[in-house]
Amino acid sequence: MDATFPPQRNITARPAPDRIRREQCKLAKRLRRQVGQAIADFGMIEANDKIMVCLSGGKDSYTLLDMLLQLRAKAPVPFELTAVNLDQKQPGFPKHVLPEYLSSIGMPHHIIEQDTYSVVTRVVPEGKTLCALCSRMRRGALYAYAETQGFTKIALGHHRDDMVATFFMNLFHHAKLSGMPPKLRSDNGKHVVIRPLAYVSETDIIAYADAREFPIIPCNLCGSQENLQRKQVGVILKAWEKEYPGRIEQIARALGNIRPSQLADQSLFDFQALGRHSNTPLPNAHAWLAGDLANDTAP
């Protein structure tokens, strides 16, 4: 007679709660370390700063706010945090989610109400991406509010992978080596923008947001109509990372390791003076091409 065996244990069962907690603690510690390092490296926060944390309801901005709150508890300098959200009047936007969450954690906050949705959908031709105009209008509204409230810094939730993707978008589509700096002054000179997640990977943010169970709000305006160029760059980067793990981190490090003399930007390095052995003025391009130019104009 065949023996009767108990059912086999599911070897793919979820990890034990203790192990999950340990992994989550390690992840939170890594993120705090990376955010703290970025703040220190780029001088993002100083004593008595009044920081406006831009909260969209996405994983990145939730993680940004959470990290800043954790770091502030033991920070070497005092600073204030206020969460600010722009209600763009998108149809179906759950207006209650952010205020309820922020109130539950005792976070000072303000909701700016401005109908940019109607403007963007009216102005942008059908079939075109809405991202560019939407971003400009959102930025304008946030900057205006920051100015009226006297905020000294504006914190955004862009992370390491965003910065790398922006670099390649500018390289591929605009023929320039520029990106998304961890800290910058706005074009009008009135605001200092900081990106404390500059060293944090998107993979870690996804894992952290999932562990913390943030009430994520999808963007109905552009979430389903992702910017095509950024999406294409994202596909390339993910393929590189899959084939060569650590590739994105290496690229991110390269953004802070520039060698102007080994590029070709004449405004950053004086190639004219390199190796000169006299003070005689150098002939310009017109002089060097005089023969060709003469031939071009010949009958």
UniProtKB/Swiss-Prot annotation:
- Annotated GO CC locations: cytoplasm
Task: Enumerate the cofactors the protein uses.
Answer: Mg(2+); [4Fe-4S] cluster
Q: Which residues cross the membrane?
A: none
What does the record give as the reaction this protein catalyses?
Answer: cytidine(32) in tRNA + S-sulfanyl-L-cysteinyl-[cysteine desulfurase] + AH2 + ATP = 2-thiocytidine(32) in tRNA + L-cysteinyl-[cysteine desulfurase] + A + AMP + diphosphate + H(+)
Any binding details for the cofactor?
Answer: Binds 1 [4Fe-4S] cluster per subunit. The cluster is chelated by three Cys residues, the fourth Fe has a free coordination site that may bind a sulfur atom transferred from the persulfide of IscS.
Highest taxon in the source lineage: Bacteria
- What terms describe the molecular function in GO for this protein? 4 iron, 4 sulfur cluster binding; ATP binding; magnesium ion binding; sulfurtransferase activity; tRNA binding
* Main subcellular localisation: cytoplasm
Q: Where in the cell is it found?
A: Cytoplasm
The pathway this protein participates in, as annotated, is: tRNA modification
Q: NCBIfam families in the record, alphabetically?
A: PRK10696.1
Give the misc comment: The thiolation reaction likely consists of two steps: a first activation step by ATP to form an adenylated intermediate of the target base of tRNA, and a second nucleophilic substitution step of the sulfur (S) atom supplied by the hydrosulfide attached to the Fe-S cluster.
Name this protein carries in UniProt: tRNA-cytidine(32) 2-sulfurtransferase
Instruction: Provide the species name.
Output: Xylella fastidiosa (strain 9a5c)
Gene that codes for this?
ttcA
